[in-house]
Regions:
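Conserved catalytic motifs of ABC-family nucleotide-binding domains
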Residues: 99
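Single conserved hydrophobic/aromatic residue that forms the stacking wall/gate
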Residues: 1-8, 13
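ABC ATPase "signature
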Residues: 162-163
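Conserved ABC ATPase signature
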Residues: 78-82, 86
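Catalytic Walker B motif of ABC-type/P-loop ATPase nucleotide-binding domains
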Residues: 103-106
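Conserved ABC ATPase "signature" region
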Residues: 56-74
Length: 219
């Protein structure tokens, strides 16, 4: 049983768990399991209300959070009328309104189409890069991790790979062993290398991959 945990540089004990929970927000795989209100802005207000935030500040937080995820114009809409990607962005807004230091996204795109997946990943990236919020993304879609600062591969609770995306995704055989598929760019470069073409295997983006192949063809 864990009786204490480390959050940032501070040691927290069981009696201070409430304050710890306020620093971490969670976004679930299915937004329908997280959305509780009949109006978008009411749903986003739910978490800060439970944290005892004053009403005037709640209003400011709700508006700011919805603008951050691009859903402010839908603030008076019914959540059940939104697309999957829009619902997930509302769920993220609800977490942002808590003003957490860290957001954990648990397979947030598993139930979304490609367009919805892109919406969610772009939102998460923006929160990290522009707002300075730590984002922990749990996913089986390796393409979603290309822009990450750090990638950790887990197998049965143990860390089997840990490093920058280029370092981790270049280990194609390891990923395959763990039931994961490397980004399509890496798979293409890996196949070309196996057929004798001298190309790097760590060009993750489509443009970098195209440049690497073009350079190899000129040699």
């Amino acid at each position: 049983e864990i009786s204490a945990c480390l959050v940032g540089s501070e040691m927290c004990i069981r009696d201070s768990l409430l304050s710890v929970r306020a620093t971490v927000g969670m976004v679930f795989q299915n937004p329908d399991n997280q959305i509780v209100a009949n109006v978008v802005e009411d749903d986003v207000a739910f978490a800060p209300e439970n944290l005892g935030v004053p009403p005037q500040e709640i209003r400011a937080r709700v508006n700011a959070a919805l603008k951050q995820v691009g859903m402010y114009d839908f603030r008076l809409h019914a959540p059940h009328l939104l697309s999957g990607g829009q619902k997930q962005r509302v769920a993220i807004a609800g977490v942002i309104a808590m003003r957490p230091k860290c957001i954990v996204l648990d397979e947030p795109t598993a139930m979304l189409d490609p367009s919805g997946r892109r919406e969610v990943i772009d939102t998460a990236t923006k929160l990290c890069r522009e707002q300075g919020i730590t984002v922990v993304l749990i996913t089986h879609h390796m393409e979603e991790c290309i822009g990450a600062d750090r990638v950790i591969v887990l197998s049965n609770g143990a860390v089997v790979a840990d490093g920058a995306p280029k370092q981790v995704f270049s280990q194609v055989d390891l990923l395959k062993k763990e039931g994961l598929t490397a980004p399509v760019t890496v798979r293409l470069l890996h196949a070309l290398r196996e057929h004798g073409m001298d190309v790097p295997i760590d060009a993750l983006t489509v443009s970098d991959c195209a440049d690497a192949v073009a350079a190899a063809l000129k040699r």
